[in-house]
From Swiss-Prot:
Protein name (Swiss-Prot/TrEMBL): Exodeoxyribonuclease 7 small subunit
Entry's Gene Ontology molecular function annotations: exodeoxyribonuclease VII activity
Enzyme class: hydrolase
UniProt-annotated location(s): Cytoplasm
Region described as Disordered: 65-84
Annotated source species: Syntrophobacter fumaroxidans (strain DSM 10017 / MPOB)
Keywords, in A-Z order: Cytoplasm, Exonuclease, Hydrolase, Nuclease
Cytoplasm in keyword set: yes
One GO term describing the cellular component: cytosol
Length: 84
C-alpha cells in the first residue's frame, strides 16, 4: 500500500533531523559525513518540494460574500520573512 504524502514528508523530515544531529556531533569519519550530508541535501529537497506543494494547495478557493469563488495566495501568519 502506498504511503500518504504527509507520511512521506514526515518520514523525510525525521531522517533529515537524524542526519543533522549526527553531523552536529562531529564524530563521523569524513567519508561517512559526506555521504550523510549528500543524503541530507536530497531529503531537504524532498521536504521543500512537499512544502511547496502544500503551499500551492493552501491557495484554496475562498468564497466571497457574493458567492463567487476566488483564489487567494497563502500568507504565513508567523511574521517570518519568506524562505526563513
Amino acid at each position: 500500500m502506498a504511503k500518504k504524502k504527509s507520511d512521506q514528508f514526515e518520514e523525510a523530515l525525521k531522517k533529515l533531523q537524524d542526519i543533522v544531529e549526527k553531523l552536529e556531533r562531529g564524530d563521523m569519519p569524513l567519508e561517512e559525513a559526506m555521504e550523510a550530508f549528500s543524503e541530507g541535501i536530497r531529503l531537504a529537497r524532498v521536504c521543500h518540494g512537499k512544502l511547496e506543494e502544500a503551499e500551492r494547495k493552501v491557495r484554496i478557493l475562498l468564497k466571497e460574500q457574493e458567492g463567487d469563488w476566488t483564489t487567494s495566495p497563502f500568507e504565513p501568519a508567523s511574521g517570518e520573512p519568506p524562505g526563513g
